[in-house]
Amino acid sequence: MRHQGTKTIETQRLILRRFTVEDAPAMYRNWASDSEVTKYLTWPTHSSVEISHQILLDWTGQYADSTFYQWAIVPKELGEPVGSIGVVHLNEQAQLVHIGYCIGTNWWHHGITSEAMQAVMDYMFDEVGVNRVESRHDPRNPNSGRVMRKCGMNYEGTLRQSDWNNQGICDASWYALLAQERNSAKSVVDTLETNAIIDDI
């Protein structure tokens, strides 16, 4: 893989950029302090802005590593982060990345997450040269699965009691897209966009 690190990506409505420590108040206010956002995630709700600040200190310190990918999701009309998306696992030999994301509830059901996900997937395939992009979700959080399907990812199955999140031991539904499948996947994405399906998180 040709690692590029976290470079700025622009879409129609979004700027995906590196976090700065100055983003801590927005991170805390817009999503990290909301238990509804973290319900099916693996990290606890932030109890103070200081926790958000410490997380961002850690992330910003890792940006010098070209294998570290963590973007702030910034709507152009707002100008501050409303969520995050990044690579939570990568495998050099298999040439794959696993993507995780979260976004504040005020921005659910507007297609923001899928727009960010599609942009990061394109970046991983075109710039980094991965062969496989994958992600997973708790089946009790079906809107996350809709994000993956909207981006053309294929459902590969649900592994029973194979994962853990803030609800405890849970099932995990897996989705993935291979480089060789992208053309057909883009046809699916175009169809969904034509039909204006935006019922994701």
Feature locations, PLM:
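A generic secondary-structure signal
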Residues: 58-62, 123
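Conserved GNAT-fold acetyl-CoA-binding loop/helix
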Residues: 38-58, 69
